[in-house]
From Swiss-Prot:
It comes from Geobacillus kaustophilus (strain HTA426). Pfam families: AAA_26. This is ATP-dependent dethiobiotin synthetase BioD. Keywords: ATP-binding, Biotin biosynthesis, Cytoplasm, Ligase, Magnesium, Metal-binding, Nucleotide-binding. The keyword Magnesium applies.
Length: 238
């Protein structure tokens, strides 16, 4: 059976989809079979028809295997989008699909919507949070963060919330990194030191993203030894 990793972030619009694509392409280059699951998707892509993340995975990253489950047009928190569209989000169905994928792939990357403290739905008089799903099904997570101003607070508070919810963080991945900016350099070092987590990737700020650019970054990630480091943490051999 394969391993599942939940790709979460310190917020929305920080590039989880880009980072997830790089990880998927790198692991495939190492001979692993990889699937990406985006269980809850809200908001449309630039074409005004497709759903944003699925559009990205299929048409930009061109991953061999990616899928979603709940698609909702309003670009808002899943619980509100579900209420407005009459959608019933069932975490048990997501878990069943995830188990099905784990039977068929070495690694399944599950991309969340926003961060850990995002409600999927309301049930039994309470909100069912993203963190509830990770805890209920014992999913380890990678924390994707920006490296710009404000990143320290966002990363530290997210990690504290994860710890309080009993969620295991495997490591950190930084996105939109600007090497010439001292604040970016120091934020990466400071966050890693404060959280005592390994830095598994530092993705530069990209003016434009294409499949070729993603492949280049994936190869660089492999050459740095970070892909194998992640697999070692998971106990997956290559």
């Amino acid at each position: 059976m394969g391993q599942a990793i939940f790709m979460t972030g310190t917020g929305t619009e920080i590039g989880k989809t880009v980072v997830t694509s790089i990880v998927a392409l790198a692991l495939e280059r190492l001979g692993m079979s990889v699937s990406v699951l985006k269980p809850v998707q809200t908001g449309l892509a630039e074409d005004g028809v497709s759903f944003a993340e699925q559009y990205w995975y299929e048409r930009v990253a061109k991953l061999s295997a990616s899928e979603g489950m709940y698609y909702m047009e309003p670009a808002m928190s899943p619980h509100l989008a579900a209420k407005l569209t009459g959608t019933s989000i069932e975490p048990e169905r997501v878990a069943e699909r995830l188990e099905w994928l784990k039977q068929r792939y070495d690694v399944v990357l599950v991309e969340g919507a926003g961060g850990l403290a995002v409600p999927w739905c309301e049930r039994d008089g309470r909100f069912y949070m993203t963190s509830d799903f990770l805890r209920d099904y014992q999913l380890p997570a990678i924390l994707v963060s920006l490296s710009s101003l404000g990143a320290i607070h966002h990363a530290v508070t997210t990690a504290a919330y994860a710890d309080a919810q009993g969620i295991r963080l495997l490591g950190l991945m930084f996105n939109q990194f600007q090497e010439q900016e001292i604040i970016h350099q120091n934020n990466v070092e400071t966050i890693a030191a404060l959280l005592r987590l390994p830095v598994l990737a530092v993705v530069p700020l990209l003016p434009a993203v294409s499949r070729r650019e993603l492949e280049t970054l994936a190869q660089h990630w492999i050459e740095q030894g970070k892909a194998k480091q992640l697999l070692e943490v998971l106990g997956v051999g290559v």
